[in-house]
């Protein structure tokens, strides 16, 4: 689940399936046009990004080592250990080398997640094939919200420039290949 404040995404699924548009209005300015979420898109070039969402109280857990490179079932063990302890993963990044995996989780779950992962991979850690997991806290997860962003060059660049210009360091990055 997500902690985004605008709309709870699982409530959209039945509407998307039945092709029913959803209109989001500003309660402080109800006469404003608002935003329409639908299966059809009609966008001007400067309307690609519709907003920015965020989730506060985020920690990242980083797990790395050569012992995970090319090992079938590694990710399955990793995520099953978290899932069996009801730890929700907000974001996932993995290096293309398969040398590391990083997840964003609610900070309230951070210490439990570290214990669970270090216990699950206790043997690999003891053999120095994988390092103990590391936690970094006091973070937030931000996302730009829009449609047809993958066909518009420079969207990510503008986001990263804005963050850098405001002295905000990016700790992990994930971008889906789909438009949803």
Name every feature range the model reports, one short phrase each.
Residues 2-180:
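C-terminal catalytic "cap/lid" subdomain
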């Amino acid at each position: 689940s997500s902690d985004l404040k605008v709309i709870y995404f699982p409530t959209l699924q039945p509407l998307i399936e039945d092709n029913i548009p959803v209109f989001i209005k500003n309660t402080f300015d109800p006469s404003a046009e608002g935003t329409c979420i639908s299966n059809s898109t009609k966008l001007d070039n400067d309307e690609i990004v519709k907003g920015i969402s965020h989730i506060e109280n985020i920690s990242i857990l980083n797990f790395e080592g050569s012992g995970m490179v090319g090992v079938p079932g590694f990710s399955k063990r990793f995520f099953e250990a978290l899932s069996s302890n009801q730890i929700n993963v907000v974001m996932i990044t993995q290096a293309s080398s398969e040398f590391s995996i990083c997840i964003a989780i609610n900070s309230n779950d951070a210490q439990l997640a570290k214990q669970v992962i270090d216990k699950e991979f206790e043997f690999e850690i003891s053999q120095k094939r994988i390092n103990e997991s590391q936690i970094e806290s006091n973070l937030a997860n931000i996302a730009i919200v829009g449609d047809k962003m993958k066909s518009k060059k420079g969207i990510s660049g503008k986001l990263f420039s804005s963050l850098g210009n405001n002295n905000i360091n990016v700790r992990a990055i994930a971008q889906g290949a789909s438009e949803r």
